Protein backbone atom coordinates (compact mmCIF):
# COMPACT_ATOMS: atom_id res chain seq x y z
CA UNK A 1 0.00 0.00 0.00
CA UNK A 2 2.76 2.45 0.95
CA UNK A 3 4.84 1.46 -2.07
CA UNK A 4 1.99 2.15 -4.48
CA UNK A 5 1.29 5.49 -2.79
CA UNK A 6 4.94 6.49 -3.03
CA UNK A 7 5.05 5.37 -6.65
CA UNK A 8 1.95 7.44 -7.40
CA UNK A 9 3.44 10.52 -5.73
CA UNK A 10 6.68 10.04 -7.65
CA UNK A 11 4.82 9.79 -10.95
CA UNK A 12 2.80 12.92 -10.19
CA UNK A 13 5.98 14.77 -9.26
CA UNK A 14 7.77 13.69 -12.43
CA UNK A 15 4.79 14.68 -14.56
CA UNK A 16 4.62 18.18 -13.09
CA UNK A 17 8.30 18.88 -12.37
CA UNK A 18 9.17 20.19 -15.87
CA UNK A 19 6.39 22.74 -15.57
CA UNK A 20 7.66 24.08 -12.27
CA UNK A 21 10.21 26.84 -12.05
CA UNK A 22 13.55 25.91 -10.65
CA UNK A 23 16.14 23.21 -11.08
CA UNK A 24 14.04 20.65 -12.96
CA UNK A 25 12.10 22.96 -15.22
CA UNK A 26 12.76 25.97 -17.41
CA UNK A 27 12.60 29.38 -15.83
CA UNK A 28 9.84 31.37 -17.37
CA UNK A 29 10.26 34.94 -18.49
CA UNK A 30 8.21 37.52 -16.67
CA UNK A 31 8.39 39.98 -19.56
CA UNK A 32 6.93 39.70 -23.03
CA UNK A 33 10.13 38.66 -24.81
CA UNK A 34 12.20 35.56 -24.39
CA UNK A 35 13.50 32.53 -26.20
CA UNK A 36 11.50 29.56 -27.44
CA UNK A 37 12.72 25.98 -26.91
CA UNK A 38 15.04 24.57 -24.31
CA UNK A 39 18.21 25.91 -25.93
CA UNK A 40 19.05 29.57 -26.32
CA UNK A 41 18.54 31.14 -29.70
CA UNK A 42 20.09 34.26 -31.11
CA UNK A 43 16.71 35.87 -31.77
CA UNK A 44 14.17 36.90 -29.15
CA UNK A 45 10.50 36.43 -29.91
CA UNK A 46 7.26 37.26 -28.16
CA UNK A 47 6.49 34.51 -25.69
CA UNK A 48 2.91 34.23 -26.91
CA UNK A 49 4.21 33.03 -30.28
CA UNK A 50 6.22 30.16 -28.77
CA UNK A 51 4.73 26.76 -29.46
CA UNK A 52 7.05 25.19 -26.89
CA UNK A 53 7.82 26.22 -23.35
CA UNK A 54 9.86 29.41 -23.21
CA UNK A 55 12.94 29.91 -21.10
CA UNK A 56 15.06 32.94 -20.33
CA UNK A 57 18.66 32.82 -21.42
CA UNK A 58 21.57 34.98 -20.40
CA UNK A 59 22.00 37.71 -22.98
CA UNK A 60 25.76 38.01 -22.72
CA UNK A 61 26.62 34.36 -22.08
CA UNK A 62 23.86 32.66 -24.06
CA UNK A 63 23.71 29.80 -21.58
CA UNK A 64 20.56 27.82 -21.06
CA UNK A 65 21.45 26.07 -17.82
CA UNK A 66 19.40 26.96 -14.81
CA UNK A 67 22.40 28.67 -13.23
CA UNK A 68 22.90 30.91 -16.26
CA UNK A 69 19.24 31.57 -16.88
CA UNK A 70 17.68 34.80 -15.81
CA UNK A 71 14.88 37.13 -16.75
CA UNK A 72 15.21 38.82 -20.10
CA UNK A 73 14.45 42.53 -19.78
CA UNK A 74 11.37 43.63 -21.67
CA UNK A 75 12.31 45.59 -24.75
CA UNK A 76 9.92 48.33 -25.74
CA UNK A 77 8.12 46.95 -28.78
CA UNK A 78 6.82 50.37 -29.81
CA UNK A 79 9.08 52.26 -32.21
CA UNK A 80 10.76 55.30 -30.76
CA UNK A 81 9.09 58.52 -31.76
CA UNK A 82 11.46 60.61 -33.79
CA UNK A 83 11.43 64.29 -33.00
CA UNK A 84 10.39 66.03 -36.17
CA UNK A 85 11.22 69.71 -36.56
CA UNK A 86 8.17 71.88 -36.37
CA UNK A 87 7.14 73.56 -39.59
CA UNK A 88 8.45 77.08 -39.83
CA UNK A 89 5.54 79.46 -40.14
CA UNK A 90 7.61 82.52 -39.36
CA UNK A 91 7.65 83.70 -42.99
CA UNK A 92 3.86 83.54 -43.19
CA UNK A 93 3.50 85.39 -39.88
CA UNK A 94 5.92 88.09 -41.06
CA UNK A 95 4.05 88.39 -44.35
CA UNK A 96 0.71 88.88 -42.61
CA UNK A 97 2.20 91.50 -40.30
CA UNK A 98 3.65 93.45 -43.21
CA UNK A 99 0.41 93.40 -45.18
CA UNK A 100 -1.61 94.75 -42.27
Curated annotation (Swiss-Prot):
CC annotations in GO: extracellular region
Intrachain S-S bonds: 29-56, 36-50, 40-57
Signal sequence, renumbered to the chain: 1-22
Principal localisation: secreted
Subcellular location: Secreted
UniProt superkingdom: Eukaryota
Keyword flag Signal: yes
Biased composition (Acidic residues): 89-100
Keywords, comma-separated and alphabetical: Antibiotic, Antimicrobial, Defensin, Disulfide bond, Secreted, Signal
Chain positions listed as propeptide in the UniProt record: 23-26
GO biological process, one term: innate immune response
Tissue-wise expression: Highly expressed in kidney, lowly expressed in spleen, and expressed at lower levels in lung.
Cited Pfam families: Defensin_beta_2
Region (Disordered), start-end ranges: 60-100
InterPro entries: Beta_defensin_dom (IPR025933)
Function: Has antimicrobial activity.
Family assignment from sequence similarity: Belongs to the beta-defensin family.
Protein name according to UniProt: Defensin-B4
Source species taxonomy: Eukaryota, Metazoa, Chordata, Craniata, Vertebrata
Amino acid sequence: MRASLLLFILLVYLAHAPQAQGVFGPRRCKGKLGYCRSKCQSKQVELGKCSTKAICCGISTGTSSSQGSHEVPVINSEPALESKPEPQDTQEEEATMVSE
